[in-house]
């Protein structure tokens, strides 16, 4: 299996300009220094030294380089192993006792306070729904919760987590639940926007994203796994066309462009990003700006590259006929869903994209999605499973940056608070009946075939996790071992799976 040229990777720096280029033009001439992508973060406002952090794109490339440096000598000497435990994944039960023991309540000063918070949260959820619905009781419970919890940086994990769930329950009580449903979650946190100006909100969002990259493998795990699979799938192609469902700032594609550029005979890369008319000109302008930056970056490395965008319909439906296709291109569909920094996308929109992929017979479909619990029940059961899930997330963030209290709090406030509110709002409106199946399962049922994760890709994922706290682990599961799952201890957090259409099997 071909890996990227390590000498070329080691020569590549994004601190100001790249020393690896096939053209005499500097990065500055193209206006593509990756530092311009990174937020200007006032690290003095966070505890800890500024040197604990790196610029956004520097971090991505450096982590990719570190992983591959470790991976290269091990390909022929290492056997594939997947860390397993004798314990089954812990399932949430509907009783108070089993639920509270599943939630992390350590380091709260007094474990009884953590247990009390869990009991009160469950009671609040019960008071809002079902046969015991009592809005007056719910209001009293929430008042008590607000006296006990704190989103302050010095609050414990359980206190901060309970604060976000309390805010979400309060939104449901006041009829505002799910306000984050159909839009970018961090731009629709009404409380946040009323206490911070739009400019401050944008800066905090960028800073929070950079911090999330430094604190956890949540973003890089999916990006690196998908990119490595793409590199392997198109190794002998002359032209590659990637259709990206949710490109955002395009940070995923820096390492792919870099990898292709390190191969003198690499293919021409074309990326088509989907834009959403429902969010107005800002969405389209953001996609176009992303395209300009990626184009400049590719040019600085001498990588043949072109960028296009394709508008979704007003209801965010994808129409394959809207794509500009070129004969002979190897098609790749890339779908990142429900990651901490991404917007919620309606199931109908996602289904239209994946159905459209099937009609175009792509070489590869890369899917990264949040792992959901297999809880069967109504709102209360789903509420407690969500509490269990985010308890694991908060625990992992604290383990990654134990001394950076204010940094963690910013990430939690900008990304996870609105995400919790939006998720619970959707569950509440549907009575807990919101679709829970994974999109990977759906792909298998509609005729897609799993593509096995390569040994190199699996090793890369494990080595990436080695850069973070040892509580993370990776599992290889799925149809024909086509799926890698990122776990925090016993809780599955997100997965990356690889697919192709049955009719294209012979091409792989």
UniProtKB/Swiss-Prot annotation:
Signal peptide: none annotated. GO terms for molecular function: DNA-binding transcription factor activity; sequence-specific DNA binding. Pfam families: GRAS (PF03514). A motif (VHIID) lies at residues 240-244. It is found in: Nucleus membrane; Endoplasmic reticulum. Residues 425-500 are annotated as: SAW. One of its GO terms (cellular component) is nucleus. Coiled coil: none annotated. Residues 75-98 are annotated as: Disordered. Expressed in roots, shoots and leaves. The keyword Iron does not apply. Its main location: nucleus. Induction: Induced 24 hours after treatment with Nod factor or Sinorhizobium meliloti. GO terms for biological process: nodulation; regulation of DNA-templated transcription; response to symbiotic fungus. Interacts with RAM1. Interacts with IPN2 and RAD1. Belongs to the GRAS family. This is Protein NODULATION SIGNALING PATHWAY 2. The gene is NSP2.
């Amino acid at each position: 299996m071909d890996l990227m040229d390590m000498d070329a990777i080691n020569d590549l720096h994004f601190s100001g300009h790249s020393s690896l280029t096939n053209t005499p033009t500097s990065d500055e001439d193209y206006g593509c220094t990756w530092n311009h992508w990174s937020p200007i973060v006032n690290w003095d406002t966070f505890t800890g030294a500024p040197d604990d952090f790196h610029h956004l794109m520097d971090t991505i490339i450096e982590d990719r380089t570190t992983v591959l440096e470790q991976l290269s000598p091990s390909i022929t000497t290492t056997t594939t192993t997947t860390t397993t435990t004798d314990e089954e994944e812990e399932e949430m039960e509907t009783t108070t006792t089993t639920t509270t023991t599943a939630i992390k309540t350590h380091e709260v000063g007094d474990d009884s306070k953590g247990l009390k918070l869990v009991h009160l949260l469950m009671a609040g959820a019960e008071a809002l729904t079902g046969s015991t619905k009592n809005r007056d009781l719910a209001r009293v419970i929430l008042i008590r919760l607000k006296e006990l919890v704190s989103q302050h940086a010095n609050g414990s994990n359980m206190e901060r987590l309970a604060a976000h769930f309390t805010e979400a329950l309060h939104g449901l009580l006041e009829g505002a639940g799910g306000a984050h449903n159909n839009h970018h979650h961090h731009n629709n946190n009404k409380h946040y926007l009323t206490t911070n100006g739009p400019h401050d909100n944008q800066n905090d969002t960028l800073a929070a994203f950079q911090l999330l990259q430094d604190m956890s493998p949540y973003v890089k795990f999916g990006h690196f796994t998908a990119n490595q699979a793409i590199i392997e799938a198109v190794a002998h192609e002359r032209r590659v066309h990637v259709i990206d469902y949710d490109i955002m700032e395009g940070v995923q594609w820096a390492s792919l462009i870099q990898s292709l550029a390190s191969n003198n005979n690499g293919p021409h890369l074309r990326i088509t990003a989907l834009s959403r008319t429902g969010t107005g000109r800002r969405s389209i302008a953001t996609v176009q700006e992303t395209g300009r930056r990626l184009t400049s970056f590719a040019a600085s490395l001498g990588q043949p590259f072109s960028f296009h965008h394709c508008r979704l319909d007003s209801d965010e439906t994808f129409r394959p006929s809207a794509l500009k296709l070129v004969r002979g291109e190897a098609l790749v569909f890339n779908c990142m869903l429900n990651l901490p920094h991404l917007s919620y996308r309606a199931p109908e929109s996602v289904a239209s994209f994946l159905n459209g992929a099937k009609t175009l017979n792509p070489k590869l479909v890369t899917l990264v999605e949040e792992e959901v619990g297999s809880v069967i029940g109504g709102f209360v059961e789903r509420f407690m499973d969500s509490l269990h899930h985010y308890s694991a997330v908060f625990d992992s963030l604290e383990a990654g940056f134990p001394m950076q209290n204010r940094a963690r709090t910013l990430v939690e406030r900008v990304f996870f608070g609105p995400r919790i509110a939006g998720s619970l709002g959707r569950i509440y409106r549907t009575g807990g009946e919101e679709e829970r199946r994974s999109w990977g399962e759906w792909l298998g049922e509609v005729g897609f075939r799993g593509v096995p994760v390569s040994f190199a890709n699996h090793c890369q994922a494990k080595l990436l996790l080695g850069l973070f706290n040892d509580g993370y682990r990776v599992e290889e599961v799925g149809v024909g071992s086509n799926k890698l799952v990122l776990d925090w201890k016993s809780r599955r957090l997100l997965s990356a799976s690889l697919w192709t259409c049955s009719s294209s099997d012979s091409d792989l």
